[in-house]
Amino acid sequence: MSGKERVVFLDRAAFTADDLPIPSFDHNWSEYPETDTADIVPRLFWATIAITHATPVDAEAIGQLHKLTRIVVTGPAMVDVDACGARGIAVRNLTAGEAPEQTLVGLLEMLVDETRR
């Protein structure tokens, strides 16, 4: 993969500013306090990595997101893993009890590293 990753956090309001430091890898970062269903595709259209806490990402949306390669789920969001699998999109969930400030950034950096190998 070449160029910067485009990371979009669909519902950042679930975390305080100190909870989730922005990752160190080369990227463009966009975040929204919350995202309505009608805004999922427009917000993720150019994204390579999506982060969602409670915003569901269904098969219909996934079918329209041709740049998306990874989804990180930090909470109860419903993501259609079958649709993701069919499109080659990796889905990773943070395990309950993990410290989000450590695991989210670490997970994002690991996913980017895996993709660049």
Sequence positions of predicted segments:
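Phosphate/diphosphate ligand-binding glycine-rich loop within oxidoreductases
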Residues: T48-R117
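N-terminal glycine-/charge-rich "phosphate-binding" loop or analogous flexible N-terminal tail
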Residues: M1-A47
